[in-house]
Amino acid sequence: MTARNLAEWQNFVQGCIDFRPNDGVYRIARDMFTEPELFELEMELIFEKVWIYACHESEIPNNNDFVTVQIGRQPMIVSRDGKGELHAMVNACEHRGATLTRVAKGNQSVFTCPFHAWCYKSDGRLVKVKAPGEYCEDFDKSSRGLKQGRIASYRGFVFVSLDTQATDSLEDFLGDAKVFLDLMVDQSPTGELEVLQGKSAYTFAGNWKLQNENGLDGYHVSTVHYNYVSTVQHRQQVNAAKGDELDTLDYSKLGAGDSETDDGWFSFKNGHSVLFSDMPNPTVRPGYNTVMPYLVEKFGEKRAEWAMHRLRNLNLYPSLFFMDQISSQLRIIRPVAWNKTEVISQCIGVKGESSEARRNRIRQFEDFFNVSGLGTPDDLVEFREQQKGFQGRIERWSDISRGYHQWTYGPTQNSQDLGIEPVITGREFTHEGLYVNQHGQWQRLILDGLNKKALKMHDVTFDNQSVMDEV
């Protein structure tokens, strides 16, 4: 296969999406998920351009704390300096490019390169060079510090952007999606959350966009997670026979098209979306008996109900899911290749919550979200099988039109209650308009990046034969 030039890439990306509202057509090309060269463009024009989730501030609470992360293809160190300020530094020595630290986290005021012992402070400044006498007198350490990206935090959630020329703030990027971070953070009387010790990291044999779709897919719940639904129903029967109540979320109604349940979704600018539903038995949530009265008193009944009586899957496109439902989970998406994705799963909770609430949160997390839980393995199988199915090139298109005749493009009672302005609203948990927003943003970012590349370079594709004729 020959490499595409810029114009050919623009045509390809333009042709990957077929949205014709007047005809009720909403479909995407499956080769969005199967092109190795496209993956490199996605890394350059999406993951190395927009704000990408890096870590939570609770993971680096002290001066000189750090974690190592991957932003697109770039190895990064996210650190606090000696004054507590945040930095996002490329984890590569300015001398010959070796990584400075090879551990996941720690506390260091100085990073010493294991290769040639150049030393950098936790704010990225180069402070020492081994055997400096062989360098010229004008060798300037102050100009050789670690390259840094933009870094910002919203209510403890730390994001990095490698586009140092961009002017958009993190809050601009998040937009109305911030409200759904607030709904979790506000459950804490101190306004602080914390990532719990330990995390799971796993890979699946599929494209990164599959995970972004799946976390917003209410349609698959009652089929793919049937075993979990059945298990919960069995627990309910056993507990009822003992006179006890169910101690986990009653998942049985989700995704079954129950018209009595207030559910649906919002899609926002920049590709963000949230899937929500009434929670059948909200009193099983960690700390419910103390958190709910606190929220009602401080924020009012409606906002308290949104925080504690509704489950929410928030996708901050393209790199993070914040699940506040069966338990509370951060699901970080890290693309590895066009057909391989790493997911990092962490439990996040209210800082200072009671030991009983914390125990409940962890048990509920392990039950469904953990790698060995009853939910995650089901989804990973479907990612793998979708990626296999996409090789069936006779059919190019996937349909994402479910419920299009009921999508709303103006205010609803729910959006007014929350003070938000979604670009699309769905009134049913299983409708697929969230993907229209998600993949529309994918196309916008790629095309915008390609157009900017076209302005910066003159793209020439040589015909080998004509060149030889001239020789």
UniProtKB/Swiss-Prot annotation:
Q: Which GO terms describe its biological process?
A: catabolic process
Known pathway? Aromatic compound metabolism; anthranilate degradation via hydroxylation; catechol from anthranilate: step 1/1
Q: Which cofactor does it need?
A: Fe cation; [2Fe-2S] cluster
InterPro entries in the record: Anthranilate_1-2-diOase_lsu, Rieske_2Fe-2S, Rieske_2Fe-2S_sf, Ring-hydroxy_dOase_2Fe2S_BS, Ring_hydroxy_dOase_asu_C_dom, Rng_hydr_dOase-A
Please identify the protein, giving its name as recorded. Anthranilate 1,2-dioxygenase large subunit
Cofactor, free-text remark: Binds 1 Fe cation per subunit. Binds 1 [2Fe-2S] cluster per subunit.
Under Enzyme Commission nomenclature, its number is 1.14.12.1
- CDD domains linked to this entry: RHO_alpha_C_AntDO-like, Rieske_RO_Alpha_N
Similarity comment text for this entry:
Belongs to the bacterial ring-hydroxylating dioxygenase alpha subunit family.
Residues binding Fe cation are 220, 225, 379
Record text on subunit structure and interactions: The anthranilate dioxygenase (AntDO) multicomponent enzyme system is composed of an oxygenase component and a NADH:acceptor reductase component (AntC). The oxygenase component is a heterohexamer of 3 large (AntA) and 3 small (AntB) subunits.
**pH-linked activity:** Optimum pH is 6.3 for the reverse reaction.
Q: What does this protein do?
A: Component of anthranilate dioxygenase multicomponent enzyme system which catalyzes the incorporation of both atoms of molecular oxygen into anthranilate to form catechol.
Residues binding [2Fe-2S] cluster are 93, 95, 113, 116
Entry keywords, A to Z: 2Fe-2S, Aromatic hydrocarbons catabolism, Dioxygenase, Iron, Iron-sulfur, Metal-binding, NAD, Oxidoreductase
Has keyword Manganese? no
Q: Which Gene3D superfamilies would you find in this protein's record?
A: Naphthalene 1,2-dioxygenase Alpha Subunit, Chain A, domain 1, Rieske [2Fe-2S] iron-sulphur domain
**Taxonomically, which superkingdom?**
Bacteria
The GO terms describing molecular function are:
2 iron, 2 sulfur cluster binding; anthranilate 1,2-dioxygenase (deaminating, decarboxylating) activity; iron ion binding
Per its record, what triggers expression of this gene product?
A: By anthranilate.
